[in-house]
């Protein structure tokens, strides 16, 4: 890795932002940890930031030469808030931007796909990370994790579709390389784990590793959409349910070598993630 200036991490307490901040600071890089509450992050300088409050943007960008961008959560049109900020960042001297997107959203596609499309014209050095679904969705604060704890059930409209679930630590490791390597990737990177699993497989692995029975219940698209509307805005719920339907049709049944290629090590398996969490909690 090359010596860098200061990296602004937007969403520094989130699933990938917190891990990216931790890996950067552990390697000796300077980090500004941005969030609405400016929550302290070990080894980083906390700074208040709200996508929807432009008054917070200039101070967050002060002294920064690269940014890690996590879009505003649940916003079906993040470009409206993100693109003005990115133009400001470019004017403020930021020369490298790494955007967190999704394997389900192509360049120019819905939601953050519009930001993806704009990024190469704004920054000479850039990358778009397009991870598959996070393994941490089943262990953290995600709706799947909550329903596993509360009901022993994973609810989806994904049927028997398979997904290359990826560990957030591996996403962060790729983000660190994309932010700090001498040459930026200047491309989008689809990030997956080493294998594809159905939600039935996920339930079976959780049951085997934890000893607690977990099952996958399959819902029709409409019921899944309606279930999600109790948790997120209606338009975003429809988009998430559409993603489940795409999984059912095979859209996420793939693996890539991007994690291994960028980090020099293979991605972690879901079983290894659960085994590690069980050891930490015992």
Segments (PLM) and residue ranges:
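A hydrophobic C-terminal alpha-helical subdomain
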Residues: 221-282
């Amino acid at each position: 890795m090359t010596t860098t200036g200061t990296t602004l991490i937007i969403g520094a307490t989130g699933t990938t932002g917190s891990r990216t901040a931790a890996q950067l600071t552990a390697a000796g890089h300077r980090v500004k940890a941005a969030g609405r509450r400016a929550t302290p992050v070990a080894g980083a300088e906390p700074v208040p930031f709200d996508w929807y409050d432009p008054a917070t943007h200039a101070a967050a960008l002060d002294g920064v030469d690269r940014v890690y961008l996590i879009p505003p959560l649940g916003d079906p049109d993040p470009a409206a808030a993100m693109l003005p900020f990115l133009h400001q960042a470019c004017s403020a001297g930021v020369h490298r931007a790494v955007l967190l997107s999704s394997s389900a959203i192509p360049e120019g596609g819905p939601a953050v796909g519009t930001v993806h499309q704009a990024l190469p014209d704004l920054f000479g050095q850039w990358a778009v990370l397009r991870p598959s679904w996070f393994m941490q969705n089943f262990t953290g604060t995600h709706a799947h994790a909550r329903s596993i704890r509360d009901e022993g059930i994973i609810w989806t409209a994904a049927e028997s579709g398979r997904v290359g679930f990826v560990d957030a630590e591996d996403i962060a490791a790729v983000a660190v390389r994309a932010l700090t390597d001498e040459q930026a990737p200047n491309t989008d990177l689809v990030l997956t784990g080493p294998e594809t699993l159905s939600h039935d497989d996920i339930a079976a692995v959780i049951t085997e590793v934890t000893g607690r029975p977990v099952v996958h219940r399959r819902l029709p698209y409409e019921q899944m959409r309606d279930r999600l509307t109790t948790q997120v805005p209606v338009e975003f719920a429809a988009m998430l349910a559409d993603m489940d339907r795409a999984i059912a049709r095979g859209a996420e049944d793939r693996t890539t070598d991007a994690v291994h290629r960028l980090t020099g090590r293979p991605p972690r398996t879901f079983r290894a993630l659960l085994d590690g969490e069980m050891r930490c909690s015992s």
